[in-house]
Structures are given as structure tokens and as C-alpha cells.
Amino acid sequence: MKRVGSVVAWSVVWAAACAVLSAQNWPSFRGPGASGVADGAPTPVKWNAATGENVLWKTPVPGVAVSSPIVWGDRVFVSTAVSSDPAAGIRTGLYGDVEPAKDVSKHAWKLVALDRRTGKVLWERVAHEGIPKTKRHPKSSQASATPVTDGRRVIVSFGSEGLYAYDVDGKPLWTRDLGVLNAGWFYDPDYEWGIGSSPIIWKNLVIVQCDIQKGSFLAAFDVASGAPVWRTAREEIPSWSTPAIYEGDGHAELITQATTFTRGYDPGTGKELWRLSGNSEITIPTPVIGPGLIIVTNGYFRVQPIFAIKPGATGDITLKGDQTQNQSIAWSTPRGGPYIPTPIIYGDQLYVLGINGVLAAYNVRSGERVYQARVGNGGSFSASPVAADGKIYVASEDGDIFVFKAGPAYELLATNAMGQVVMATPAISNGVIIVRGLKDVFAIGMKP
């Protein structure tokens, strides 16, 4: 590492903080604290993208992007990559191909700001133009990382094309070259899939997780100036997970998951605190911070684990033999973890959605499975669930958004067709659901 510059009580504080913050802003991938929760205002059950029922606005955003929208105040921010090839697109569904997309044309990488109330484009900025330095997965894009904001600055990562900072009015502030980030099939570096991990902000730091074929690292930059603060080397193969921050009991932990280890770090210094092995070969979901627990999941070959980790661990906390818990792990299961969607904790349940639409709900404290159900009729899911107003929203790649009631049994309330592919995780702000489709950004809310 290189230096450059009681559960109940916590549950109440955590739930209250998430509710208050998420009612105002959705500043990063999966919103405040990466929770995916935005209570505090009523949200719609049904809408109709074709007729406009409960659709407040719809704004086209050119390009191919699977990054998610973020919201701060009266602005929505989205990133995109506009290819000069009119045939550029993504391939949805379930398949096992490892070949990257053949789109190697000139691109323009952009950050776009929309008015949250009207959908009007307030500004757009071209961060970079050129031929991509690495290829991308057919299901992904050259703009896969979700921006992050602290309300003054918006930070967006375009991977090998750089890390960029703007103020909320679109003024360029700084940029950082992260190097060529070749993330792809670990068995053959020629199969490039692109990066997917989004930057996060903690206090005065922007933190990025860059797990690549060679030279993986975790790095922090000053959010105001872009100056490097610390950089920690990682012995990891490519992963696509966004890090998360646990804060409680007077300390903070930066949680990263990857194939070799899930790790906890001191976010202020980059020093490793603990590590846990036992993950699948590909790791994508973001760690989820719950009531006195850190939930880590992944769901590729050969295992699909769910770990409920107690904060404050030190050293190697890997389970031994047939163990399912130890001093640092409250509970675990070797099966049931999701491949792409990040789970969500809502109330006292952990909801885990598989890429094939199989949904399982667990008691978050005990790990007991409450129910299992199938969402939809066999479609594929890349977007992560989000929740508000006692409801959970799940978007399929085909563009159907399923709304079901949170609770001890699966109860589907509505299915809403967006009319286009949806890969990005929705944002929720003040009762309005911001849905990023492959062509348009929608604001869904209850009309007077």
C-alpha cells in the first residue's frame, strides 16, 4: 500500500438515515449508502409508457450506456458513450459467449444533466473522443460506470478513457488517467469486456476499484482537486463490483468484493483490515450494508455464496471446512447468490434476484429463507432491485418493470412495460422513479 498525501439501535439509526437521505437525493449507484431504498414519499404502482399514464417526462439520450441515473436536488445526471457506428448496440438475454462486441468505432464519452422536474437537457459535456482503448462485453457498454455526486461535483469514470470531475453546472474541474483497464475473461486477456465498477465518494475522497488482468488496484483521489491520496495494489483478476462503505460504532470500512477475496479496508488510508475467500469466478454485485451486517454475494461458477459479515473484523475470516459462520460471519450459504443484480435489504428481509428472475427473500439477521418465487416468465435481469413506499421495483432486460409488495410472501402488484431495453438500475427521488432505458430516460410518478 502506497500513501500519497447493539444491532437494534444500529438498525433504527440505519433505517432512519436511509429514509431521510433517499427522500432528497440519489447520489450514486443504488442511491444513498448504496442501499437501493428511498422511503419518504408515495411511489406509483402502475404506469403506461405508451399512453403516458403516470409518466411525468421522457427524454432521449443518444448513445449506448448501461450506467444508472443519479439525482441531486433538481438535476438528474447520466453518462453515455456515443458511437459513430449507427449499428452499435447491446445484446440482451442469457448466453455464454465470451467474445467482446465488435464496435471499435470512434466514440464520444459524455455526461448529461437533465432537469428533474421537466426532463429538459440542461447541459452535456464531452469528456473524451476517440477509439476505445479496450473492447466491451456485448451486454455492456463503453459507459457502464454510474456517476457519483456530493452535490457540488459530479464524478464519472469512463475506465480506460479516464476519471472526470465537473461541477453541477457542467464546468470541468479535473481529470485523472487511470491507465488502460483491461477487464475481461480471466482465462484469455484478448477477450476484453470493459469496466463496470462505479466510483464512490466518502468524505473528501473519490474511491475507485480497478480489478483488471494485470496490476489491479484500489485508489483514492481528493474530490475537489483530483490529487492522488492513496493507492493500494490488489492481487485480483478482473471483477465488476462497486465498493461500498460501512460506517458505525465510530469507525468506517471500505468493502470490496472480487474473485480472490472480499476485503475490508480503512477508507482513509487504503490499509487492508480483513479478507474473506470463497467467491465465484466472476463477481459483480455490490456489497450491501444492513443493520449491523455487511452482505456480500456473487453467483457465477463454481459457488454462489451469500455472506453476512459482522463489522470490525480483522485478518483472514475465511470459513473453514463445512462452517457456515464464525466469529466474524453471522451466517452464510454456499448457494443462492446472484450473478449480476445487487440484492436489497428492505425491512428485515434480504431480497436476492437472480439473472434468470428467480427471487429469494431471507431473514437478514438469521439467513433463514422466507420464500422463493419467479419474477416474470423467464426473462433475464441485469438491473438491481430498488425499493420505496413498501414496494420493490425490479426491471427486466426486456423493459418490464415488476412491482411487488415487500413482506413475508411474494405478491405481485403490477407489471409495467417501458417499451425498450432496460439494463440500468432505476433511481428514486421524492416519490419519482427515474428509469434509464437504452434510448430514453423516464420520470415515473403519480400525476395529480
Language-model-detected regions and their locations in the chain:
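N-terminal hydrophobic targeting signals that begin at the initiator methionine
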Residues: 1-2
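Bacterial N-terminal signal peptides
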Residues: 7-20
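Noncatalytic, solvent-exposed loop/strand surfaces
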Residues: 22-448
